[in-house]
């Protein structure tokens, strides 16, 4: 589906189960303390002929791309899942999730979904919405007022053999890189003051830090942003209109931000971050940046650590 999320597909979902269980346990327990409330069901804005199943929005997600979507105890959970649920509710429809992997074209032709979440590419074969999320490899620091390093002695932690580590080596040099087995270790070292920064995908990094209760803030971009959109068949004009209108309502009403904050904590918009442009080790082959597994930072080793705890 996209470079970063393809890397996520190589990550063991076992590593994320502990994080998902903890997050959802808090949500469930919080709900138990409040009075039950059932909102009035909205009228469907799409006719039966516009959908594969009358009254149901079939949504394709990549269930190997945590924290956007991942299997946990038999359910698919994540940011894209929550946004899809909000979209379905706004359209007056029930939600049905389908794990379609990263192939958008086959999702429509073989899985019979109405929309697909988390699409980065554009194609004449399908329509895409305006972006609803964005990500990039960034530098995290313990203090939000921290600037990106320009000289002197500093250390940046990044997951071993990841695109984040490659970016650190490219922009600052190998002497400033501390390779870590997983992002959990990297953020714990940041919290302990053993490193000055952590380099990681903005979404994955924020998710791990937030789940661990560690204060870490993105302070600089190490690459251009990637935007994530919703796709549907190019011939499905009614669905396109419904997605456009519903997504706009959710964005203007702050619902997307609430969902992001639930999973990631409050974050500085990437558009507000400065871009590091210095390069000390220009790459010989740009394609190397797209072929590294593990660039999104959560590994099976990290999951084993969580299980032991």
Summary of predicted features, one role per range:
Residues 130, 140-157:
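Flexible hinge/capping segments at coil-to-helix
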Residues 27-31:
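C-terminal motif of bacterial Sec signal peptides marking the signal peptidase cleavage site
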Residues 96-109, 178-192, 226:
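Short helix-initiation/N-cap motifs at beta->coil->alpha
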Residues 106, 119-127, 196-225:
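A ligand-binding cleft/hinge motif common to bilobed small-molecule-binding domains
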Residues 34-39, 167-185, 248-309:
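Ligand-binding clefts/hinges and TM-proximal coupling segments of bilobed small-molecule sensing domains
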Residues 37-119:
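Extracytoplasmic small-molecule ligand-binding "clamshell" domains
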Residues 63, 133-141, 206-248, 266-286:
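Periplasmic-binding protein-like
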Residues 33-37, 81-90, 152-163, 229-270:
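Extended ligand-binding regions for polar small-molecule ligands
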């Amino acid at each position: 589906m996209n470079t970063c999320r393809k890397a996520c597909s190589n990550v063991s979902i076992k590593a994320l189960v502990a994080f998902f269980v903890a997050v959802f346990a808090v949500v469930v327990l919080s709900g138990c303390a409040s009075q039950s409330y059932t909102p009035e069901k909205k009228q469907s804005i799409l006719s039966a002929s516009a959908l594969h199943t009358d009254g149901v929005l079939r949504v394709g997600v990549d269930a190997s791309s945590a924290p956007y979507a991942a299997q946990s105890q038999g359910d698919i959970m994540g940011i894209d899942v929550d946004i899809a649920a909000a979209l379905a509710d706004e359209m007056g429809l029930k939600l049905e999730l389908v794990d379609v992997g990263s192939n958008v074209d086959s999702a429509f032709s073989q899985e019979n979904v109405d929309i697909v979440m988390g699409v980065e590419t554009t194609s004449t074969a399908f329509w895409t919405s305006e972006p609803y999320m964005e990500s990039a490899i960034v530098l995290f620091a313990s203090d939000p007022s921290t600037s990106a390093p320009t000289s002197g002695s500093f250390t940046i932690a990044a997951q071993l053999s990841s695109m984040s580590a490659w970016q650190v080596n490219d922009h600052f040099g190998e002497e400033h890189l501390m390779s870590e087995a997983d992002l959990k270790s990297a953020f714990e070292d940041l919290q302990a003051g053993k490193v000055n920064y952590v380099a990681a995908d903005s979404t994955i990094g924020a998710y791990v830090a937030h789940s661990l209760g560690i204060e870490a803030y993105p302070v600089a971009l190490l690459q251009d942003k990637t935007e994530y959109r919703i796709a549907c068949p190019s011939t499905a004009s009614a669905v396109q209109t419904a997605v456009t209108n519903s997504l706009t309502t959710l964005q203007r009403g702050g619902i997307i931000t609430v969902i992001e904050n639930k999973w990631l904590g409050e974050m500085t918009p990437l558009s507000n971050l400065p871009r590091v442009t210095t390069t000390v080790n220009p790459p010989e082959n740009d394609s190397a940046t797209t072929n590294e597994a593990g660039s999104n930072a959560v590994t099976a080793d990290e999951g084993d650590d969580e299980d032991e705890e």
